[in-house]
Amino acid sequence: MPSRGLIVFCALLGALILGWLAWRGFSSRRPLGEAPVPAIDKQPVAFASRTFDPDTLPADMPPLASGESAECDSQFLSSASVRGESRQTDATHATVTITQIKVTLQLNINIWVPTGVTQHVIEHEDGHRQISEYYYQTAGKLAERIAAPYMGKQVEITGTDLGAESNKMLQQIATDITDEYNKELNPGPTQLLYDAITDHGRNEVVVKDAVAHALKNITIESTQPTTNPGN
């Protein structure tokens, strides 16, 4: 029975991106010798398993592709807030030093199965969940690695409205951080390989074996199309 797991990234789901500016003379309040680090808030996985009537699909359920009867909808969300301190050199020039970065991460998983579905289909969709949660295990370290190089960075800004220019720059850094997080996280190829191994849940390959094989061999075996990961 065909099934589907949908990976949706935060950039397309309205992830909050905030830029904040502390517009004052630069003065460090951090103890001497302490290197600045970004703050990472990694939320627990939010998981729900839901059933539906195939003849009356719930309004909040993602659409099923043709021929599919169930799906695993995994949403990786991220938001970043960036703060800076400014040293103004004249009326139209300033240097902004990045002093604080906070990245918040979330993973929301919903498995949708029709009433009366077989246990085999449920297990297949749960395999997609396992893959998503595997990638999320190290998401905090990934976000920290991406955000860390921006800490302490000094950016020259110019303009007649230095406050607006500073906020624009901080917002762009926040966007760059979340965009890079989405790009590098990338569980899609592993989900595709898992579907190739299991024939989208149609064969009798044991789910735990398929998940383990996909996670181990993705770098050398993933040659599947890049559309609809998790089918």
Q: What role is predicted for each listed range?
A:
Residues 8-21:
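Hydrophobic membrane-insertion alpha-helices, especially the h-region
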Residues 36-97, 103, 150-231:
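Metalloprotease/metallohydrolase-associated module, dominated by Zn2+-dependent proteases
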Residues 19-31:
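Membrane-interface motif at the C-terminal end of an N-terminal transmembrane signal
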Residues 1-5:
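Positively charged n-region of N-terminal signal peptides that target proteins for export
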Residues 99-101, 105-107, 111:
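Early exported N-terminus immediately downstream of N-terminal targeting peptides
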